[in-house]
């Protein structure tokens, strides 16, 4: 009895705590696009129709059970089928289904048909990151899980507990997708390897990313803010480490962001033609390694025996640089290609791998990567 009282008290305390239900909800989000709000309205309409049907059906059933029970001396009626009743209980559900199907069909058409978009963004799923391309603006970048979340994966239990209490744990990225408010955006969604799924609940968008195919979706965000999503298709060991973060900003801020990204691109192209020092390459390479390579080869370069080779003492990192450059550019069995990275990033990460972890490989310059492409 004492154990039962203790357990009951603990449950009551948990239910009564504010933190237990601070962000807990059973309902879907309304979202910040007209489309997501239409979907929410459909969801709620169907819910209340089901509630009304449940009240009528179960109300009639329980009333019949109680009011016509045998203990009250009620005798069951003896009658055959009623054509009128059969028409009623067939016709009413048909009318309900038609009433629900009309707005649902309209919303489905709105989801699938986009007459004109103000801008286009190509979304490419890659194990285990997202690549975003703005073809009209000439902008392209890869979005990885934020380093703050990566660091805690192998942290102490106390450090993990501290981060688990943060709402952005495993939901933050190093580079956000940026979109202007009140702008119709067409998303072209594909994959470089396996099937992924690009899902942003606030947009009402959830679309498969299939290798070799391009699926499209669209959204017109109406509110400025930061919105999060996730890969919604089991895609390998780090499936849970593929968050999506979208910043919806004013049109003026978006124009400034585009200008800054285009300036970064010019600077990046210029950096690929210059000679870098080993220290500069190693410093930059460590950041690239932690974002793109540490998930498999581990942050300390130890790898996972029998699965992912170690960087420490590797024949690749201590061997000819040309072979390693080709491996990073084109991939290998069990390792994806990293052509989406800039020449400077590839040169930096290769140099980091070849000059860290006790290795004594040669330094690689961005021009070496440019020549190998």
Per-range role (PLM):
Residues 1-22:
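N-terminal secretory/membrane targeting signals
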Residues 22-45, 65-279, 283:
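Non-transmembrane, membrane-proximal soluble domains of secreted or membrane proteins
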Residues 43-68:
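Alpha-helical transmembrane segments
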Residues 232-236, 297-303, 329, 351-355:
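Detector for the c-type heme attachment site
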Residues 242-247, 304-310:
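Short cysteine/histidine-rich zinc-coordinating motifs and their immediately flanking basic loops
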Residues 261-291, 336-373:
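Flexible coil segments in periplasmic/lumen-exposed cytochrome c-class electron-transfer proteins
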Residues 278-304, 312-313, 318-330:
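Sequence/structural segment immediately N-terminal to covalent heme-attachment motifs in c-type
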């Amino acid at each position: 009895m004492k154990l039962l009282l203790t357990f009951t008290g603990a449950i009551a305390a948990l239910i009564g705590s504010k933190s237990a239900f601070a962000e807990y909800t059973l309902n879907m989000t309304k979202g910040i696009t007209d489309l997501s709000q239409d979907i929410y309205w459909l969801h709620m309409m169907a819910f209340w129709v089901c509630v009304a049907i449940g009240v009528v059906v179960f109300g009639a059933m329980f009333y019949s059970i109680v009011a016509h029970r045998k203990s009250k001396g009620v005798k069951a009626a003896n009658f055959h089928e009623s054509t009128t009743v059969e028409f009623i209980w067939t016709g009413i559900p048909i009318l309900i289904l038609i009433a629900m199907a009309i707005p649902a069909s309209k919303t489905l058409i709105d989801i699938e048909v986009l007459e004109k978009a103000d801008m286009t963004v190509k979304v490419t799923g890659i194990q285990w990151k997202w690549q975003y391309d703005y073809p009209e603006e000439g902008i392209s970048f890869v979005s990885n899980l934020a380093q703050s979340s990566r660091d805690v994966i192998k942290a102490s239990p106390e450090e993990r507990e501290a981060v688990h209490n943060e709402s952005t744990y495993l939901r933050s990225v190093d580079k956000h997708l940026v979109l202007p408010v009140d702008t119709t955006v067409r998303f072209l969604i594909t994959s470089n390897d396996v099937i992924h799924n690009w899902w942003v609940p606030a947009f009402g968008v959830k679309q498969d990313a299939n290798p070799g195919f391009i699926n499209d979706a669209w959204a017109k965000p109406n509110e400025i803010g930061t919105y999060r999503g996730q890969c919604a298709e089991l895609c390998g060991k780090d499936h849970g480490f593929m968050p999506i973060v979208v910043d919806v900003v004013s049109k003026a801020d978006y124009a400034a962001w585009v200008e800054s990204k285009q300036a970064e691109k010019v600077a990046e192209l210029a950096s690929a033609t210059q000679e870098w020092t080993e220290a500069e390459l190693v410093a930059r390479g460590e950041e690239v390694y932690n974002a793109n390579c540490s998930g498999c080869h581990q942050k300390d370069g130890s790898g996972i025996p029998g699965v992912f080779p170690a960087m420490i003492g590797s024949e690749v990192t201590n061997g000819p640089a040309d072979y390693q450059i080709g491996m990073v550019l084109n991939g290998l069995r069990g390792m994806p290609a990293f052509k989406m990275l800039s020449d400077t990033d590839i040169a930096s990460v290769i140099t980091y791998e070849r000059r860290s972890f006790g290795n004594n490989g040669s330094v690689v310059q961005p021009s070496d990567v440019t020549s190998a492409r």
